[in-house]
């Protein structure tokens, strides 16, 4: 069942439960963003600055370096805890990611929630919610948490499958309204908590099919995110990683915290 350990390291010794739907921090309960989040990557810190508790998107087409950038952030970012949600990825890619990041020092403060592409749509959608809930639980303990969700596009695909099965008519390129609303609700759950003093910084990868930056999922995510990092295929083909397109990327809070 969902929530069970799959790493062969024994049972999870949890004594508390947290709802998959989470406890979204209301706008009036969020503390102001005042500190820069240190991603550990100079180009991101300098060119696409974002703060602790912000929601940031990584937008790119297939094979442009999203996974490379995500690996770099997991290894270099400064946070009390890191939660990675791998949703709808191939089982081999999930296995490779776990092998790379759960054998070294990062394993002590990193949790991975994985629901590969061969699982049912409802499990893939629940996996994204569980990863977010775990990050929320750690935030409620006063920790500064980094949530990385890969990817919002796969989450939207799962929500679209469920919506179509329930008879909901498709709208933008076949996505029913509930599918796009689902990713919006996931993003809104990140932020700083005034009550606990904890923070949850969200980084969400978005697959731009065919490098189309006007894809419905890209548009929906961009509208609510506090900033986004666009990866360029042209820059990647020159062998420059991370292939950040500075002109297309955006930090909406740079003036406030720098």
Which residues does each predicted region cover?
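P-loop NTPase catalytic core
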Residues: 46-49, 53-257
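Short, glycine/charged-enriched hinge/interface segments at domain edges or termini
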Residues: 1-75
């Amino acid at each position: 069942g969902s929530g069970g350990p799959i790493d062969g390291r024994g049972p999870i010794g949890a004594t508390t439960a947290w709802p998959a739907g989470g406890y979204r921090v209301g706008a009036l309960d969020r503390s102001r963003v005042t500190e820069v989040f240190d991603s550990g990557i100079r180009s991101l810190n300098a060119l696409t600055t974002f703060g602790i508790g912000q929601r940031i998107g990584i937008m790119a087409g297939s094979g442009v370096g999203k996974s490379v950038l995500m690996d770099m952030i997991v290894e270099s970012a400064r946070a009390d805890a890191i939660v990675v949600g791998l949703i709808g990825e191939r089982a081999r890619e999930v296995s490779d990611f776990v092998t790379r990041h759960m054998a070294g020092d990062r394993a002590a403060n990193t949790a991975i929630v994985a629901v590969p592409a061969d699982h049912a749509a409802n499990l893939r959608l629940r996996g994204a919610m569980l990863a977010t809930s775990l990050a929320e639980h750690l935030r409620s303990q006063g920790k500064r948490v980094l949530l990385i969700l890969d990817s919002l596009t796969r989450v939207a695909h799962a929500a679209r499958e469920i919506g179509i099965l329930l008879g909901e008519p498709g709208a933008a390129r076949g996505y029913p309204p509930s599918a796009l609303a689902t990713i919006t609700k996931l993003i809104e759950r990140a932020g700083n908590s005034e009550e606990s003093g904890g923070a949850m910084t969200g980084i969400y990868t978005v697959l731009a099919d065919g490098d189309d930056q006007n894809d419905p999922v890209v548009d929906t995510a961009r509208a609510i995110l506090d900033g986004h990092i666009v990866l360029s295929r042209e820059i990647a083909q020159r062998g420059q990683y991370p292939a950040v397109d500075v002109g297309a990327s955006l930090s909406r809070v740079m003036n406030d915290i720098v």
